[in-house]
């Protein structure tokens, strides 16, 4: 956590905790100045212990506070400093705060509990709300982008109706598409399926469990890592009732800032000149030779898209009850026309003490309603459609021009003549009851019950009058329902005996999931008004009416335990184990063990480090843990039957069924064994601090669909465990107070991570599977090409591009190098000459956050990027130059001196481009106002933020930030795209007493 943002957070905290009761008090007045080694500390919190009565220091570090009596205890704190406590009558006039190395007393959530940061032995990164990314976020994971070394978050789209992010911790750990690479999300103790229903303004912290020793306590769901989200709650219990109101909101303007690389209308009509006579465009003109220039992208997009968001919270506390109730509203326009998302999120969190402290209760309830209006045009068609094609044609019944001979429909017509939207609701609730067993000091027993429920409803309609005849007059609707229930019982015990501290937790967990969906389609409606409202009134007697439904469920049950021990906060050890069963696995392998152990040694606590002022903190960590990967869907281990069509029998059609999946009673979870070695450090009076981690992973029993003989099998493929994959990496996070002079402070925080993986075994001959390689990364564009571009092969990593090694173009002929060093051309190139020609995985990823503060002004600049990866520019390959251009063309390979015709016959590294980039992802400037003690306003901050303002890259496509987290097609920039945008946002945060 950087120090300046910590000061800003402390300023907010100090202003928020000031109580309205302050004016009515006639107690004891304390005043003074708070300094550190460099001078006044701005934004330190001065708080009467046990209350919300407080003040914050001003520009000169000064404060005045009226407390209840001379005997009251007063805490002086600021994030990044050690807290000091004084009796009011003994509070000095000048208080000097000492910086707290890496905020060692900060609490880190580790799953089924929490620890002080200095006691953590696993690889865990904690990000507090004050350090989140600013700006418009379609998903809470965007708050973490670039903040945590080893956490790879890819922004895949600017469409507000999509989450827009793919998340991966420490690279690939599976080859199973169904299981995916996303981490497990825990929200306030509940494992959830969706975090997009959380208002970013209501998140207090996000803790990332990266290594196996930290994640093993989550068993079969811990392989991809865990992100624990803690939402905001009411203030601490206080004797005097306190209430405050908070508001945060912003308005944002978005504009296109990406270019796909296709010819503009002006370039298209001049292609013959620009290409040196090699490319002749087809100009669509009337009988008089007149033609129009149509910028199809402009026709489908807004000049400016507007988003506004508002969050109101009421926070209260008393001696036995506290609460936080919040309502958030957001309306986000997409840069595409007719594209919008609207959502309302409500949440209440409450805590209660009862039975003289024996019983503690926590209640959480949240609800979201949303509506997505989807874009029904097609940006790929807009990009490749001939720019001299008119939009309208008065001779057509619906007034739109029908493109001829291109296999492309009119994208403006589709946008205006079609509609598609989704709306839905989401509920999550939980209650936790904790009984403090007072006869046994440090022992408490908790019961936790939670539910999660979501329903989504989809509607779409294509109008009857449509030049795209195949899509005319059709409608559909579908619904899906998801429900899960969770029950947990835990016992916690914590005691300190002299220099020995012992903490343990043991528990049982049961979670059940239910999924239900249905859909129906029809066409041929009597009027346009019926569509999906009266879908049964379509042409049901003919062949188009289609209905389907499904219902599945699965269950997880587990017992778990963990023991933490430390001696004198120097020697640390943690051990955990989970025994878990999943109904998704085969009957012979439903249960498994997931152990973990980790150690820590705080070197700076040793006697030989006394007097070594250059080192404020040195802690070595070492850990080992086993995690699993639950199957991504139900019923994968049992035999399945599917509809095989119909045949005529005895005067009617009869449905047939056939085997579509083999039974596998031995199907089990993938198992990951992970070793981690880490160092937490702070040097030079805590001016430099951070962490270094090295890890090695072994993933065993990889899942794969293997080809099997029929008979004895009834279906030609079998999902089984046979493969192996290893990965390793280095993660470095550094925070440094680069400048601290007078009112100026500059904190810089770079992070960098290196990750490699290699498939060590794709199959197992002893089990009847003898695979060494298989191709993936399939691409196909309107019949132009249809091939696989990647390979999964033993000895290579995921994302290996597989094709022909480009050598040269001579007299229009393409030449390639063979693996043996020979040369072939297009006519003689054979499958045997294909080889690994690149990789979609970057050599390293990085982020760099900078925060500058001067008095009440704060500014931050955040950069992030990747280096060393290849991107397949499919648009360049499929729609590059050709002798006769009936459709639009990609311009990179067109010059007057040398125009290269696209080689659509073969995949070659000519079409792989350097995907490295650095982005100026976020720039924020803010100002925090000071208010007098008796002001109604506690806090007011205004800010201006710019997002995605600059990208430095060699890539010729719209955006080099393509998906690199997919097992099967990482690094492929498909022609289907949504325009990238830059955002400018104005916002404010205000709270009232």
Indicate residue ranges for each PLM-predicted region:
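Extracellular/periplasmic, surface-exposed regions of secreted and cell-surface proteins
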Residues: 132, 182, 188, 305-308, ...
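Short, small/polar-rich motifs associated with maturation and membrane association
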Residues: 1-348, 353-354, 359-362, 368, ...
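Short Gly/aromatic-enriched secondary-structure transition segments
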Residues: 261-263, 462-463, 521-525, 765-766, ...
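Conserved small-residue
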Residues: 244-292, 519, 720, 737-840, ...
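Catalytic-site beta-strand/loop segments enriched in glycine and acidic/polar residues
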Residues: 184-187, 572-581, 818-841, 902
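Glycine-rich, aromatic-lined ligand/substrate-binding cores of catalytic
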Residues: 839-871
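Short aromatic-centered micro-motifs
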Residues: 46, 76, 185, 495, ...
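C-terminal beta-barrel architecture of Gram-negative outer-membrane proteins
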Residues: 859-920
């Amino acid at each position: 956590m950087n120090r300046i943002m910590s000061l800003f957070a402390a300023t907010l905290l100090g202003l928020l905790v000031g109580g309205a009761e302050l004016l009515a008090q006639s107690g004891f007045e304390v005043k003074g100045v708070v300094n550190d080694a460099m001078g006044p500390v701005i934004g330190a919190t001065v708080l009467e212990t046990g209350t919300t009565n407080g003040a914050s220091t001003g520009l000169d570090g000064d404060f005045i506070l009226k407390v209840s009596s001379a005997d009251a205890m007063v805490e002086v704190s600021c994030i990044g400093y050690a807290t000091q406590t004084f009796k009011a009558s003994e509070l000095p006039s000048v208080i000097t705060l000492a910086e707290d190395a890496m905020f060692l007393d900060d609490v880190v959530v580790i799953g089924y509990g929490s620890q002080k940061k200095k006691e953590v032995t696993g690889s865990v990164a904690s990000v507090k709300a004050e350090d989140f990314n600013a700006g418009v976020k379609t998903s809470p994971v965007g708050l973490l982008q670039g903040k945590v070394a080893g956490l790879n978050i890819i922004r895949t789209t600017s469409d507000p109706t999509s989450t827009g992010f793919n998340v991966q911790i420490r690279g690939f750990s599976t080859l199973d598409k169904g299981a995916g690479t996303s981490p497990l999300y825990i929200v306030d103790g509940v494992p959830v399926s969706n975090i997009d229903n959380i208002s970013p303004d209501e998140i207090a912290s996000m803790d990332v469990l990266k290594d196996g020793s930290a994640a093993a306590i989550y068993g079969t769901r811990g392989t991809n890592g865990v992100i624990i989200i803690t939402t905001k709650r009411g203030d601490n219990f206080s004797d005097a009732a306190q209430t405050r109101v908070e508001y945060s909101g912003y308005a944002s303007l978005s504009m296109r800032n990406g270019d796909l690389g296709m010819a503009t209308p002006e370039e298209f009509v001049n292609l013959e000149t620009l290409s040196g006579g090699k490319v002749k465009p087809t100009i669509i003109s009337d009988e008089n030779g007149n033609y129009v220039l149509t910028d199809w992208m402009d026709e489908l997009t807004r000049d400016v898209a507007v988003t506004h968001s508002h969050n109101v919270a009421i926070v209260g506390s008393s001696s036995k009850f506290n609460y936080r109730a919040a309502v958030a509203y957001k309306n986000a326009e997409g840069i595409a026309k007719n594209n919008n998302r609207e959502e309302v999120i409500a949440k209440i969190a409450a805590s209660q003490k009862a039975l003289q402290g024996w019983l503690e209760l926590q209640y959480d309830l949240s609800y979201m309603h949303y509506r997505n209006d989807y874009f029904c045009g097609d940006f790929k068609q807009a990009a490749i459609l001939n720019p001299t094609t008119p939009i309208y044609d008065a001779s057509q019944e619906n007034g739109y021009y029908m493109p001829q001979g291109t296999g492309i429909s009119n994208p403006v017509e589709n946008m205006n003549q079609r509609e598609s939207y989704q709306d839905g609701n989401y509920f999550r609730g939980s209650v936790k009851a904790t009984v403090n067993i007072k006869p046994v000091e440090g022992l408490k027993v908790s019961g936790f019950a939670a539910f999660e429920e979501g329903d989504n409803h989809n509607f779409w309609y294509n109008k009857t009058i449509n030049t795209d005849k195949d899509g005319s007059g059709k409608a559909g609707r579908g619904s899906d329902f998801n429900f899960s229930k969770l029950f947990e019982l835990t016992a916690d015990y914590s005691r300190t005996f002299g220099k020995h501290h012992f903490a343990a937790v043991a528990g049982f967990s049961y979670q059940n999931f239910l999924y239900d969906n249905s859909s129906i389609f029809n066409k041929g409606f009597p009027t346009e008004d019926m569509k999906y409202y009266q879908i049964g009134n379509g042409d049901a007697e003919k062949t188009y009416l289609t209905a389907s439904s499904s219902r599945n469920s699965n269950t997880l049950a587990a017992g778990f335990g963990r023991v933490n021990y430390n001696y004198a906060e120097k020697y640390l050890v943690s051990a955990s184990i989970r025994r878990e069963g999943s109904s998704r696995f085969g009957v012979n392998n439903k249960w498994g063990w997931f152990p973990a152990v980790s150690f820590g040694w705080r070197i700076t606590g040793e006697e030989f480090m006394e007097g070594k002022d250059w080192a404020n903190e040195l802690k070595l960590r070492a850990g080992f843990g086993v995690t699993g990967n639950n199957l991504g869907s139900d019923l994968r281990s049992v035999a399945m039957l599917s509809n095989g069509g119909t045949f005529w029998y005895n005067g009617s059609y009869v449905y047939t069924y056939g085997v579509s999946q083999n039974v596998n009673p031995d199907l089990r979870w993938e198992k990951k064994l992970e070793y981690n070695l880490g160092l937490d450090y702070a040097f030079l009076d805590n001016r430099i601090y951070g962490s270094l981690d090295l890890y090695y992973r072994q993933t065993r029993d990889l899942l794969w669909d293997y080809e099997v003989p029929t008979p004895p099998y009834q279906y030609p493929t079998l999902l089984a465990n046979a493969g192996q994959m290893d990965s390793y990496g280095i993660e470095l996070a550094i925070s440094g107070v680069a400048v601290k002079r007078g009112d100026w402070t500059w904190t810089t925080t770079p992070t960098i991570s290196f990750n490699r993986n290699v498939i060590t075994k794709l199959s197992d001959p002893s089990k009847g599977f003898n695979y060494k390689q298989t191709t993936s990364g399939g691409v196909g564009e309107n019949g132009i090409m249809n091939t696989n571009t990647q390979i999964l092969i033993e000895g290579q990593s995921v994302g290996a591009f597989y094709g022909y090694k480009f050598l040269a173009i001579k007299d229009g002929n393409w030449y390639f190098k063979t693996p043996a060093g020979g040369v072939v051309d297009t006519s003689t190139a054979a499958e045997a000459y294909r080889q690994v020609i690149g990789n979609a995985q970057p050599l390293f990823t990085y982020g760099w956050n900078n925060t500058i503060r001067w008095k009440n002004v704060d500014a931050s600049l955040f950069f992030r990027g990747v280096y060393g990866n290849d991107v397949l520019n499919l648009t360049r390959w499929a729609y590059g130059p050709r002798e006769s251009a009936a459709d639009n063309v990609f311009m990179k390979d067109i010059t007057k001196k040398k125009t290269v015709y696209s080689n659509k016959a073969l995949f070659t590294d000519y079409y792989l481009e350097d995907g490295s980039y650095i982005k100026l992802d976020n720039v924020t400037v803010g100002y925090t106002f000071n208010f007098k003690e008796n002001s109604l306003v506690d806090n007011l901050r205004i800010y201006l933020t710019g997002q995605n303002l600059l990208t430095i890259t060699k890539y010729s496509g719209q955006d080099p930030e393509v998906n690199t987290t997919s097992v099967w097609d990482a690094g492929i920039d498909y022609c289907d795209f949504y325009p990238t945008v830059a955002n400018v946002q104005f916002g404010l945060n205000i709270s009232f007493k």
